């Protein structure tokens, strides 16, 4: 899976392994009805001390990251993740994606982007997700939805 070689980057930063675009596509793709990555799969790509941040939480450590992913899957009837674009430059990667969550018969769609920073060992040491949590979550809810759309209109228009 990993090709062992050294890549020399600016400022004398050296990565001994490189995660490929295909590796990231595999991690960031999950059709409805398929299993989420296993703990072993996460451990292949994530540093033991990974820092994960998204609009709803911040975790530190691989076990906490895995628990956060497991909690998301357990809260939902099903989850999908579709990758649109991936870019890797030196020790930084970006993944553009769409996540779908089916909860109690309703589907919530979240377009987003992930920024990944790779450590010297080539594993992901920081994972930060950027997406709008409130609009897709509360937009479809009666009473809250119109209020959220009104509030957004005050900031965006």
Predicted regions and their residues:
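Flexible interhelical turns and helix-capping residues at alpha-helix boundaries
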Residues: 32-35, 54, 105
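Short acidic-aromatic low-complexity motifs
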Residues: 16-48
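Short, Lys/Arg-enriched N-terminal segments with co-localized hydrophobic residues
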Residues: 1-14
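Short linear motifs centered on Gly/Pro in flexible linkers and helix caps
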Residues: 7-8, 19, 125
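A generic structural signal for ordered secondary structure
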Residues: 20-30, 69, 81, 112-114
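A solvent-exposed, acidic/Ser-Thr-rich amphipathic alpha-helical stretch
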Residues: 39-91
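A beta-strand edge to alpha-helix "cap/lid" segment located at domain peripheries
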Residues: 74-80, 87-157
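Short histidine/acidic/glycine/proline-rich micro-motifs that form metal-
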Residues: 30, 56-58, 101-102
């Amino acid at each position: 899976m990993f090709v062992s070689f050294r890549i020399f980057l600016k400022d004398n930063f050296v990565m001994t392994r490189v995660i490929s675009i295909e590796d990231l596509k595999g991690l960031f793709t999950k059709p409805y009805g398929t299993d989420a990555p296993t703990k072993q799969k996460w451990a292949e790509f994530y540093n033991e001390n990974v820092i994960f941040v998204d609009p709803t939480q911040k975790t530190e450590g691989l076990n906490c990251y895995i628990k956060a992913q497991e909690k998301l899957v357990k809260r939902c009837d099903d989850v999908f993740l579709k990758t649109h674009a991936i870019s890797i430059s030196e020790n930084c990667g970006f993944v553009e994606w769409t996540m779908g969550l089916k909860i109690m018969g309703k589907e919530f769609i979240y377009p987003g982007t992930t920024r990944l920073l790779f450590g010297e060992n080539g594993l992901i040491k920081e994972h930060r997700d950027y997406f709008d949590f409130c609009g897709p979550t509360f937009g479809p809810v009666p009473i809250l939805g119109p209020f959220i759309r009104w509030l957004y209109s005050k900031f965006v228009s």
